[in-house]
Amino acid sequence: MTKQQMIAMFIAMIITSALVSAATIMGGIWYLNKQAQDSGETSSLLENSPLSFLVTEQPTSKGPSFHPLDKVVLSIKGKKQTHFVMLELAIETRRPERIKDIDNYMPMVQNSLLKLFSDKTFDELQQTGAIDILQNEVKQTLLVAFAKTDIVRDIDDVLLTKYVVQ
């Protein structure tokens, strides 16, 4: 046998061994669950083991859920006077249980929005299409603000639910 044939045979043996091992484990799990169901036990052997993820179903929310955030009032520059912007935001998620603590981050949200609006002018916010642009900017700002937290992966969208400029 040549060196290439030996390597090919060795790789084939490793793959075969891995497949047989995986099939044995899956067959054992199936057998144990089948035995538990046939014997009338209410819980299977795996439910209390480290392999419980194999038999438990993860609940998923079918539709989106919206979590409202506190109202944010900011000042913006005008030509002759200072104006105020009032925003109410909602976070869209499909995992509401994972963002239940988002209200604890409101100071971070307010700080991020304050930085975003510090460069805005009254005229910019009154232009046609400003709300769509602003919504995208607010979303990106909040995603950056939450980037160092676990919450960021559960935010599907950020919506402006109220927008008042005076």
Curated annotation (Swiss-Prot):
- Main localization category: membrane
Asked whether the UniProt record includes Chaperone among its keywords, one would answer no
Q: What is the lineage of its organism?
A: Bacteria, Pseudomonadati, Pseudomonadota, Gammaproteobacteria, Vibrionales
Tell me where on the tree of life, at the top rank, the source sits.
Answer: Bacteria
Expression triggers: Under conditions in which the polar flagellum is not functional.
State where the protein is found. Cell inner membrane
| Keywords from the named record | Cell inner membrane, Cell membrane, Chemotaxis, Flagellar rotation, Membrane, Transmembrane, Transmembrane helix
The membrane spanning regions, by residue number, are 6-26
| Descriptive protein name | Flagellar protein LafL
- The record lists the organism as Vibrio parahaemolyticus serotype O3:K6 (strain RIMD 2210633)
